Amino acid sequence: MEKPTRQTPFYTQHRAELLVLSSQIAAALLHALARVVEVGSGLKERVHPFTVLQIRLFITVLGCTAYLWRARIDFLGPTGLRPLLALRAAGGVFGACGFYLSISYLSLSEATVLNFIAPLGAIMLTTYWEGRTFAFLDLIACITALAGVVLVLQPIPIYKAVAQAEISSSISTDPYAHLKGVVSGITGVAGGIVAFSAMNRLGKNVQPAVTINYFGVSICIVTTAFSTIMPEVVWPTRIESWCLLAIIGILGLVMEYLLTAGLGSDDPRVTIMIYSQVLWALFLDWAIWRSHVNVLTVLGSMVVVASLAVPYLFRESSHPKEDMFSTRSGMDDIEEGQDEAHANYISLE
């Protein structure tokens, strides 16, 4: 590959990084809008998280299905990999439902940082599956990331010890509601770990649109089933809610496209751009809900991002020619689990 010269336009030289960065801006925006409709910020009705997921993934499924049909790709994927695709979808359902429930009770930045733990858990699980020794660097990264999450979630004793400031308006003042958010987030992380681990095993043997379709269809089926047994899971009645949900769905489709296009590059800087979603979440918390971003929140976010990014960069620099495929696959597919992520994906998730 020819080395870029000084005359190379900035966009051409950094196209992949800019695409992934744009995808994370889209992801943060759609998550912020999802929280707006879930908590009813400035609206006259609240929309249940399952309804948000149902409409968002329905639009994504339509887009992916149209692409697969035009490209003449089998909707179900390779026969031998369908059990793994189903496992990825099942994990994704728990991951997305947990994340979207958590943003009803936690701030956007809290839920996002918590969701980013899933990739580290996936590395641990795939290491166990493959019978490999767990690297010391990964162990340190996991411990550091958990410490960062504690700083972001700020248990009451720690928070009071640092400052007696008023609790942010974006965080529920009800301790039980906050606990629900944390439990939902942890459930999402568990689902994300399963989803990312399955994607690690799938590798590049499956078209990304097929993987997304499995996940999207599963979400639509599950949320539709819940709508029949949970009276609160209903479609919105106001036009502004529908407009926001449509924007969420379109942003989700745009995010998937930008992420897939950007991750075609082997440059490790591209993957690092995924972690910028934490910064956008912090900014949107302040811009929309005027949340008080304290030192612990910023420090915890930086610790989590560093614990994810540093081990990856270390591997890339230590083994430039080695195929670090199993690790890259999980990191590359983080926005598909959150939502995701991480999800996500999430995401992380």
Swiss-Prot record:
SUPFAM superfamilies in UniProt: Multidrug resistance efflux transporter EmrE (SSF103481)
Domain EamA residue range list: 25-153
Keyword Transport: yes
The keyword Membrane belongs to this UniProt entry's keyword annotation: yes
An annotated GO cellular component: membrane
Matches recorded under Pfam families: EamA
Compartments in which it is found: Membrane
Membrane topology value: Multi-pass membrane protein
Keywords per UniProt: Membrane, Transmembrane, Transmembrane helix, Transport, Virulence
Residue ranges crossing the lipid bilayer per the database entry: 49-69, 89-109, 111-131, 133-153, 179-199, 215-235, 244-264, 269-289, 294-314
UniProt xrefs under InterPro entries: EamA_dom
Function, in words: Probable transporter; part of the gene cluster that mediates the biosynthesis of the secondary metabolite victorin, the molecular basis for Victoria blight of oats.
Family: Belongs to the TPT transporter family. SLC35D subfamily.
Protein name: Probable transporter vicT
Species annotation: Bipolaris victoriae (strain FI3)
Native organism taxonomy: Eukaryota, Fungi, Dikarya, Ascomycota, Pezizomycotina
